[in-house]
Amino acid sequence: AYWFHGTRTSADNTFDSGLLPLNQTESLVMDMLVNLAPDVVVKERLQAWNFHAGVPDTLFRTRTRNEMHWGPYGHLVQEVHFHARKLWQHDYLRLPELVEDVCNAYQKKYGQDLTEHYLKVLKPCIVCFRADIEYEKGAFEAALSYAYTSVRELPPDSGAVFGIDRHGISVCLDEIVNVEFTKLHELDG
């Protein structure tokens, strides 16, 4: 099956190393945020956090230390990413969780919200990859739900939400079908 991993990243990210689980992306995410920091002060402060579990945020530490959160993850229905909030999903095209955690920690510690800056410099991206379906009935139900709403020109409903968890195993470069930077985001507000 084809799966769709949503993120927001630097425009030059080619995913040459594949899609990595969170425990392997921690330093890459921090390097990206440091390199794209709005000024020297922010850059130095973020650099000081750039070591394993160095971000002073409980969620960041949980996500990078606990393999239950590592993923990588993907949705079976690509359009779910464009209606994430309506479907009670995290909006990865807006900000990935680790980036959000860093912004939250920075605001708490230094009183400056970096969210708008990183929304401007990072670009929404969907990585399509191939992987086996582990639960065929769930995938079939999601596909039927999506077909039902799609032919009626409606956005997907919660029945179309079905995903894959790679359980800490990377998506290799040869499993990646396409990397698409998109301007489409949150079609339903």
Predicted regions and their residues:
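Conserved NAD+-utilizing ADP-ribose enzyme module
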Residues: 1, 10-16, 20-22, 27-31, ...
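Histidine-centered active-site/metal-ligand motif
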Residues: 5
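Low-complexity, serine/threonine/proline-enriched polar segments
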Residues: 23-72, 76-85
